[in-house]
Amino acid sequence: MKFGRLGELKHGYNAMTTRDSDMMMDIGYQVMDAGEELSFQDPEQETAFVILSGQAEIRWNGQSEKMHRDSLFDENPYCLHVPRNTKVTMKADTAAEVLIQKTDNEKDFAPKFYRPEDVQADIFGGGVWSGTATRTVRTIFDYSNAPYSNMVNGEVINSPGRWSGYAPHTHPQPEVYTYKFDRPQGFGACFIGDNAFKISHNSWSELSGGNSHPQVTAPGYAMWYSWMIRHLPNNPWNKTRIDDPDHEWLMQPDADEKIWSPTKK
């Protein structure tokens, strides 16, 4: 269990987690200037590139695509996912920020370029608990559409004052959250097991397997976060969810009838 803050991002690579940590993944933000060109090629790790802002051209194996993003909150992402030892070149057409996720994988697979229309977006928590945990969950790739990968990559949009990762639950696989707000002074709270941490812009949390991990954002501030899971050997995350027994009653159809409200008499 760990929590960290990057503050204002610097030009270049801004590291958060490393492959030799409990998270088993290299994760960081690559900040690029307009016109800058960079190449990446990891001999041992698969890699996912998710554009967060700006516009860039990305090239691999003789192919080329444009990635762009004006809003984390209103737009689904572009993502390139490649196996180990694949050379990828990015050229920023404008100032750009890219999330990079990597982990060990001996499997060779065909690179996959995900466009916004390829990303699954679901509304979770709708119609229950007076809407206090309604959020948008985006899944770029997971075990269902990329069983060859050792990773999962997706995003959550928390509306102001709402919860996510709720009701409290666990899974054995490690997970990393990286956070951004619609305003840089935005804040929220991250609960990891029995510990709580203040979420700020460009902070991140490392969720060890077996810990519940609900999140909440303050009223007035919308929160985006990337959720990245590392599969375990012979134990992939396949939408794995173990509900906290203390809060299982919230999952019952009549839960709203049992929740106190000032309008009830």
Question: Across the structure, where does each feature detected by a protein language model lie?
Answer:
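Glycine- and acidic-residue-biased ligand/ion/polar-headgroup-sensing regions
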Residues: 43-64, 82, 160-161, 172-204, ...
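Generic beta-strand structural signal
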Residues: 78-80, 86-88, 94-97, 136, ...
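Double-stranded beta-helix
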Residues: 96-136, 226-265
